[in-house]
């Protein structure tokens, strides 16, 4: 199947996701026939994609960007190739991990949300509306058979005074 990430970068929200899901199903049918396997029962989903979002320069899954500018920190073993490469070629990005300085490092990657991106200053209800939109316009149309569809993977954080409203929503 096809999973989307970077939704809060806001590029896909105005697009016709139902048509895109239809294209995914059609292409899955074509390729499945070509290689002699069954068509996928579920062809579309949304999940957080930490590493993918870093490589692509997007937000993670359906979640908002942390802020307009921020530092993203990743912990890595000092035996990993990425650590060795950055230590030699860009040492300003690498620091010893406080609790395990002997074998673990922290890579600090500056982030900048693109103009027009959704930031985490949005309300929980804005995120819920986005989850609903993507679930109904992307995930559900990509479902072929079976009682379980994929879901949009999301963490919704509610403030104390939002619980009742969220329950009614």
Predicted regions and their residues:
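Functionally constrained cores in energy, signaling, and assembly domains
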Residues: 10-12, 52, 91
């Amino acid at each position: 199947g096809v999973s989307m990430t970077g939704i809060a970068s806001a590029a896909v929200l105005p697009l016709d996701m139902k048509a895109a899901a239809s294209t995914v199903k059609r292409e899955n049918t074509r390729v499945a026939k070509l290689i002699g396997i069954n068509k996928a029962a579920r062809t579309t989903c949304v999940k957080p994609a930490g590493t993918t979002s870093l490589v692509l320069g997007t937000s993670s899954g359906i979640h908002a960007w942390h802020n307009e500018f921020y530092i993203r920190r990743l912990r890595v073993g000092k035996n990993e190739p990425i650590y060795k490469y950055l230590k030699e070629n860009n040492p300003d990005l690498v620091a010893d991990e406080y609790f395990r300085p002997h074998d673990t490092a922290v890579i600090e990657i500056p982030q900048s949300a693109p103009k027009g991106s959704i930031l985490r200053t949005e309300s929980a209800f804005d995120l819920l509306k986005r989850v609903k939109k993507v679930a109904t316009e992307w995930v559900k149309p990509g479902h072929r058979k079976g009682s379980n569809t994929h879901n949009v993977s999301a963490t919704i954080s509610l403030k104390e005074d939002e619980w009742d409203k969220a329950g009614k929503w």
